[in-house]
């Protein structure tokens, strides 16, 4: 069965931080959006989050016809998905909830509409088990803020058709994203596994009194993080090998991998460690509100994305290379 690849109506189930980010991105790309969330006050909270994201999206550039009023909020799953060309679920990370939700979504949706889940920790073969037409079901795992960060990890389950993966890649690309196909179902996918390793080491460094939360963030944002934003890890290390490249780098620094630097297992989250992390991040935040920091984050991300795009174009590269 061919799947819908060019969409006009986007369904969003779940309207928290991730779900609202999807809604804002879809609206900014000129789509009609139908949203559903059973939580009390969900519609008002969703519209406020979209309004908060809109200034950054305006700076980035809106598609023709993009408007916040193209968001509809409905009271049932069936109303949300039955006319949708693409469906994105962003419900809480509970297997029982997602099993029930996707059985209802797939029963009411068009049979050729791709169904995606924003899950970061559950595997698609598990929670799409009760879905009808599971061949069109994928994971589409985004990163916060969804309306600005382009990466989306696409993961198929045991029943997912290759054509569904390709359809999802095309749809996300039309939404201005950089789809990354995760070839195997593994917990945490790709990006979160890398982030989790860094998070574990950071917690150990705080726990052992080596550094404060602010010092660890400085080590990233004034060092490796700057290179990571446009080169990633492997290309950075290729350059570290000089003219001889990655082979020389691995021969020279490979033995260091066996040194007992890494802690690997996570530290126990004692009250003392939690207090140190909370107090440290509170000091970093200072008197600024979360809303102020979100605006700072969005403006800075826009500047970084623009700078990367400009520099890549200068060197004959596209943004997604």
From Swiss-Prot:
InterPro entries per record: 3-OHacyl-CoA_DH_NAD-bd (IPR006176), 3HC_DH_C (IPR006108), 6-PGluconate_DH-like_C_sf (IPR008927), 6PGD_dom2 (IPR013328), L-carnitine_dehydrogenase (IPR026578), NAD(P)-bd_dom_sf (IPR036291)
Segments for region (Important for catalytic activity): 317-321
Cell location: Cytoplasm
Activity regulation information from UniProt: The enzyme activity is strongly inhibited by Ag(+), Ni(+), Hg(+), and p-chloromercuribenzoate, and partially inhibited by Li(+), Ca(2+), Mn(2+), Co(2+), Cu(2+), and Zn(2+).
Binding site for NAD(+): 14-19
Gene Ontology CC entries for this record: cytoplasm
EC number: 1.1.1.108
Pathway: Amine and polyamine metabolism; carnitine metabolism
Keywords, comma-separated and alphabetical: Cytoplasm, NAD, Oxidoreductase
Biological-process GO terms, alphabetical: carnitine catabolic process; fatty acid metabolic process
Predominant subcellular localization, coarse grouping: cytoplasm
GO molecular function, one term: NAD binding
One Pfam family here: 3HCDH
Catalysed reaction, written as an equation: carnitine + NAD(+) = 3-dehydrocarnitine + NADH + H(+)
pH profile: Optimum pH is 9.5 for the oxidation reaction and 6.5 for the reduction reaction.
Biological role stated in the UniProt entry: Catalyzes the NAD(+)-dependent oxidation of L-carnitine to 3-dehydrocarnitine. Is specific for L-carnitine and NAD(+) as substrates since D-carnitine, other carnitine analogs such as choline and betaine, and NADP(+) are not substrates. Despite a high similarity to 3-hydroxyacyl-CoA dehydrogenases, cannot dehydrogenate 3-hydroxybutylate and 3-hydroxybutyl-CoA. Is probably involved in a L-carnitine degradation pathway that allows Pseudomonas sp. strain NBRC 13558 to grow on L-carnitine as the sole source of carbon and nitrogen.
UniProt family annotation: Belongs to the 3-hydroxyacyl-CoA dehydrogenase family. L-carnitine dehydrogenase subfamily.
Oligomer and partners: Homodimer.
Listed name of the protein: L-carnitine dehydrogenase
Protein source organism: Pseudomonas sp
Gene this chain is encoded by: Xt-cdh
